């Protein structure tokens, strides 16, 4: 019996009742008009405001993206300039070091040549002094030997003439 009551109730709910349909439609229209007057404006306004907020966020995101891309390009340009500048500084440093090395080498070679020339001059001067000393000693020995041989002492001018002629004879014989 309980089951037959449920079936009757379900049947009455599913069967159309024209009065109920009329009043349901009128109630729906009234609620719709009330919602249009009261809630439709704020809902549409909220949706439009939400749309504007979303569009604003999208615009800000696009501008932030463009700005970040511009900053990235600028940073890449600055990095490229810094690389070029560092390469230039390194190249200039190497050039300066090469030039400095060449200058130092040139100065050292020049100093070495000067020292060699000075040493040669000093050797030549010492050689001349030694030859002069040797000539004087040879002249003295020659005079003493000649004195012993001829048993007479020669005066200074005569000795000088004899020594000079002997030295010239020796010089011509050597050359």
Curated annotation (Swiss-Prot):
Keywords: ATP synthesis, Cell inner membrane, Cell membrane, CF(0), Hydrogen ion transport, Ion transport, Membrane, Transmembrane, Transmembrane helix, Transport. The chain crosses the membrane at residues 20-40. GO terms for molecular function: proton-transporting ATP synthase activity, rotational mechanism; proton-transporting ATPase activity, rotational mechanism. Pfam families: ATP-synt_B. It is found in: Cell inner membrane. GO terms for cellular component: plasma membrane; proton-transporting ATP synthase complex. InterPro entries: ATP_synth_B-like_membr_sf (IPR028987), ATP_synth_b/b'su_bac/chlpt (IPR002146), ATP_synth_F0_bsu_bac (IPR005864), ATP_synthase_B_chain (IPR050059). NCBIfam families: ATP_synt_b, PRK14472.1. F-type ATPases have 2 components, F(1) - the catalytic core - and F(0) - the membrane proton channel. F(1) has five subunits: alpha(3), beta(3), gamma(1), delta(1), epsilon(1). F(0) has four main subunits: a(1), b(2) and c(10-14). The alpha and beta chains form an alternating ring which encloses part of the gamma chain. F(1) is attached to F(0) by a central stalk formed by the gamma and epsilon chains, while a peripheral stalk is formed by the delta and b chains. Belongs to the ATPase B chain family. HAMAP family: ATP_synth_b_bprime. PANTHER family: ATP SYNTHASE SUBUNIT B, ATP SYNTHASE SUBUNIT B', CHLOROPLASTIC. F(1)F(0) ATP synthase produces ATP from ADP in the presence of a proton or sodium gradient. F-type ATPases consist of two structural domains, F(1) containing the extramembraneous catalytic core and F(0) containing the membrane proton channel, linked together by a central stalk and a peripheral stalk. During catalysis, ATP synthesis in the catalytic domain of F(1) is coupled via a rotary mechanism of the central stalk subunits to proton translocation. This is ATP synthase subunit b. It comes from Pelodictyon phaeoclathratiforme (strain DSM 5477 / BU-1). The lineage of its organism: Bacteria, Pseudomonadati, Chlorobiota, Chlorobiia, Chlorobiales. The gene is atpF.
């Amino acid at each position: 019996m309980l089951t037959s009551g449920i079936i009757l109730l379900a049947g009455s709910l599913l069967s159309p009742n024209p009065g109920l349909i009329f009043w349901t439609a009128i109630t729906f229209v009234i609620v719709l008009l009330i919602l249009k007057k009261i809630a439709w404006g704020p809902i549409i306004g909220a949706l439009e405001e939400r749309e504007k907020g979303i569009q604003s966020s999208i615009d800000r995101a696009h501008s932030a993206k463009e700005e970040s891309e511009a900053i990235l390009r600028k940073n890449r340009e600055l990095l490229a300039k810094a690389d070029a500048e560092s390469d230039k500084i390194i190249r200039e440093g190497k050039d300066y070091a090469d030039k400095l090395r060449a200058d130092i080498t040139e100065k050292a070679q020049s100093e070495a040549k000067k020292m060699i020339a000075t040493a040669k001059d000093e050797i030549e001067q010492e050689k001349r002094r030694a030859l002069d000393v040797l000539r004087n000693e040879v002249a003295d020995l020659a005079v003493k030997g000649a004195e012993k041989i001829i048993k007479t002492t020669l005066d200074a001018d005569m000795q000088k003439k004899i020594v000079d002629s002997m030295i010239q004879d020796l010089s011509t014989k050597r050359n």
